[in-house]
Amino acid sequence: MSQGFRTDIQALRGLAVSLVLFYHAGFDFLGAGFLGVDVFFVISGFLITDMVRKEVEAGRFSFKTFYFRRAKRLLPAAYATFLASAVVAPFALNAQELQDFIKQVWGAVTFSANLVLLMQTGYFSGAADLKPLLHTWSLSIEEQYYLLLPAFLAFTPRRYWVPGGVLMFVASLGMCLGLQSFKPTATFYLLPTRGWELGVGSMIALMPGLMLRLQPVLAALFWPAVAVLAVIPVFPTGLPHPGLDALLVCLATAVVIARRHPLLERALVSRALARVGDVSYSLYLAHWPPFAFLKNASVSTVTPLQSLLTLMVGIGLGLLLYRCVEMPTRRWQPQPSRGFAFGTFVTSCCVIRSEERRVGK
């Protein structure tokens, strides 16, 4: 279960972001393309847990190094997206929408966008389509998970990792299923009711020996898991989300990751999806604001042609973000320092504050 570069995981990323992009573009054949986010959650839980577990076991884990790497990997492209959206927002949003947008930016910068959006709207409501940073809710959940997971692994004795992980997984899933009927919006947006999805990935990373022993079982489950990932986004269960559909997709994703089928390393479709997966983070960041700004500017229903053109614009912006921001900052190799994260945060706060003053005039 080595982390390394894995074509199969990159292909899963490519599938996930494709589902989300086509769903947001309004393609009718993807009634549940939003499940791509659930695939992302499992992948993130697996990769982060696998990395931290190995470093803790080797006695070389450092909180400073971990959070520096996360900041360098995630923040530049995200903050570039927030800044570009802030430039466009005054020309596309009315006064109230602009005030809401500024709150969304504050939430995204402070890893609490899911909480801000919970106070503003439900994800599936019509008003949600008008929010340029709606998609940052999932990034905030992942970042909140990254704040908690390393502490759990670093300070908990190894013999309690799996029992503790199972307990938290069951508690989170139970809260999700139990609260879905009563608090659907909160269930959608909050880490306690979404953490189990990242926990699925974490659990297979915490049990590499068991995953090896279960390879015959995983081999039998592999193609049914692939079928789940192919079918459910097209033919959704119609049940409340997150619920049974998310559980099936998360478990299917976990099976594919744990099985590591050699076919996914060689198949042409996997390699094509892996290329998309390489740029999935920038595509995810850049694709949604154009849709939101289009819907804010439209006086009538957005046409399929407009959606297709907007999707192409979003993809183009995502590729530009990848080439000009994400890749250069990933190659940058400074020494970890508190000043990097603090300086980035302060700069972002100054930009947001400047935008607030401009709105207030």
Residue ranges of predicted features:
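Membrane-interface helix/loop caps of multi-pass membrane proteins
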Residues: M1-S337, S348
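Conserved small/polar residues in nucleotide/adenosyl-binding loops
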Residues: L248, E356-K361
